């Protein structure tokens, strides 16, 4: 506590009426990466005591919802749910509150109770962040944004890849308000993908037409995929190389011959 009293952001939080010094982390993340826009609906997972909820409400002015296993002391203009984000009943309550279209932004600044065993604490942090990601995938709007805190360690890169698989842009960021000795870092996903495919997926397709750029253009579950270096009439096995909100790119993994024409 003595260290906290000497901490600049701790003092600033007290002076400005925020519930925790973590409020300044979200402010700095948003200043740099523009996660929350005016009018956005925001869901904060693991929100107690509510420092991020206060900032989210200031930034968006829209619907803000906090979810936590603990009761969150009320904040004006903010709704709360006491529940487990892994439970279907909690997901249903979130959707009922923010609406069927989903939230514009999902945040999670939660951390596990520290044991002092770093490998264990890192694994618990990744587990918690994975739960937050799975929840976000169920409640985010298409092109929505996601921010989650994790502890750095040997499982970090695998977790980053999971986020990359679901967002157009992904980055890691450490705000100035994080303590210098802290191993925490924030993973940011921008523009949530709702496509029926992901990078690395493979499909067998018939090339029936070319797009304006000369690439093959095929539909997979109604989603446009552009395939490089193909000709009309080819049957190919493709591998998805990049996914955007409205289309994807693919390379040829195997040429399977010509498309069979009906007699």
From Swiss-Prot:
Keyword list, A-Z: Cytoplasm, Methyltransferase, rRNA processing, S-adenosyl-L-methionine, Transferase
Location within or outside the cell: Cytoplasm
Residues that, per the record, bind S-adenosyl-L-methionine: 50, 52, 68, 84, 109
Domain TRAM per the UniProt entry, residue ranges: 196-254
Entry GO MF terms: rRNA (uridine-2'-O-)-methyltransferase activity
Top-level taxon: Archaea
EC number from the UniProt entry: 2.1.1.166
A cellular-component GO term for this protein: cytoplasm
InterPro entries, alphabetized: NA-bd_OB-fold, RNA_methyltr_RlmE, RNA_MeTrfase_FtsJ_dom, rRNA-MeTfrase_E, SAM-dependent_MTases_sf, TRAM_dom
Active-site residues per Swiss-Prot or TrEMBL entry: 149 (proton acceptor)
Pfam families documented for this protein: FtsJ, TRAM
Catalysis performed (reactions): uridine(2552) in 23S rRNA + S-adenosyl-L-methionine = 2'-O-methyluridine(2552) in 23S rRNA + S-adenosyl-L-homocysteine + H(+)
HAMAP family: RNA_methyltr_E (MF_01547)
Described purpose of this protein according to its UniProt entry: Specifically methylates the uridine in position 2552 of 23S rRNA at the 2'-O position of the ribose in the fully assembled 50S ribosomal subunit.
Family, as annotated: Belongs to the class I-like SAM-binding methyltransferase superfamily. RNA methyltransferase RlmE family.
Protein name: Ribosomal RNA large subunit methyltransferase E
Organism: Methanosarcina barkeri (strain Fusaro / DSM 804)
Name of the encoding gene: rlmE
């Amino acid at each position: 506590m003595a260290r906290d009293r000497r901490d600049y952001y701790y003092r600033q939080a007290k002076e400005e009426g925020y519930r925790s010094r973590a409020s300044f982390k979200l402010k700095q993340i948003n200043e740099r990466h523009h996660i929350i826009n005016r009018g956005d609906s925001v869901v904060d997972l693991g929100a107690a005591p509510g420092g991020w909820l206060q900032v989210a409400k200031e930034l968006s002015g829209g619907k803000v919802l906090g979810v936590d296993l603990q009761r969150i002391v009320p904040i004006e203009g903010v709704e709360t749910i006491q529940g487990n984000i892994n439970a279907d009943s909690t997901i249903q309550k979130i959707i009922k509150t923010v609406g069927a279209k989903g939230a514009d932004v999902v945040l999670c600044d939660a951390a596990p109770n520290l044991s002092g065993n770093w490998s264990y604490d890192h694994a618990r942090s990744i587990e918690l962040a994975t739960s937050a990601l799975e929840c976000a995938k169920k409640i985010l709007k298409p092109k929505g944004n996601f921010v989650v805190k994790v502890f750095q360690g040997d499982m970090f890169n695998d977790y980053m890849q999971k986020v990359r698989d679901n967002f157009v842009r992904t980055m890691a960021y450490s705000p100035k308000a994080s303590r210098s000795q802290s191993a925490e870092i924030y993973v940011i996903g921008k523009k949530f993908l709702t496509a029926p495919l992901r990078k690395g997926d493979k499909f067998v397709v018939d090339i029936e037409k070319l797009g304006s750029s000369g690439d093959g253009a095929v539909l997979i579950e109604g989603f446009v995929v552009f395939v490089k270096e193909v000709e009309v009439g080819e049957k190919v096995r493709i591998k998805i190389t990049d996914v955007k909100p409205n289309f994807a790119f693919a390379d040829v993994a195997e040429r399977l011959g010509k498309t069979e024409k009906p007699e």
